[in-house]
Amino acid sequence: MFRGTHRHSLDSKGRMNVPARFRDWLNAHCDGQLVVTIDAQSQKGERCLVAYPLPTWEKVERRIAELPSNNPAARQFQRLFVGQSEELRLDAQARILLSPNLRKFAELDKELVLVGQIDKFEIWDAARWDACQETWLSGADGFACLGDLVL
């Protein structure tokens, strides 16, 4: 579904092109509809947006709806993750318009990196992505905690 890292630019109106492989899948499976939201679990310095095909988002929403409403952390997560979400559709030029709120959260500048995450993709500011990637790659035993999960 969504694999690879793709560099794109954000235009002056806040629109970004979706990579050909991503848009082909989106058009074939969900008529170009997707939901973009904030990465509510990101740590400071690692803020990005997450884009879900609409059918995948609907499954995520159902799981979120099952969270206990009396749990303060669950309510806070839902407020951020669902409350900041925006339903979008690819335009005729295969672009999506990212709102000022979403762009502000992820501190998106002109250059972007789209990172495939199998059933969704992330939208990063290019400078932030490059810095984070360098940090992650330079970590000594950074992935050792995954044990047998790493293939």
Curated annotation (Swiss-Prot):
Domain SpoVT-AbrB: 5-56, 85-128
Main location: cytoplasm
One GO CC term on file: nucleoid
Keyword line: Cytoplasm, DNA-binding, Repeat, Transcription, Transcription regulation
Gene3D superfamilies per the UniProt record, alphabetical: Transcriptional regulator MraZ domain
Self-association and partners: Forms oligomers.
SUPFAM superfamilies: AbrB/MazE/MraZ-like
One BP term from GO: negative regulation of DNA-templated transcription initiation
NCBIfam families listed in its UniProt record: division/cell wall cluster transcriptional repressor MraZ (TIGR00242)
Family: Belongs to the MraZ family.
Disulfide linkage: none
PANTHER family with a match to the protein in the record: TRANSCRIPTIONAL REGULATOR MRAZ
GO molecular function: DNA-binding transcription factor activity; transcription cis-regulatory region binding
Keyword Acetylation: no
PROSITE patterns membership: SPOVT_ABRB
Name assigned to this protein: Transcriptional regulator MraZ
Entry keyword Zinc: no
Compartments (UniProt record): Cytoplasm, Nucleoid
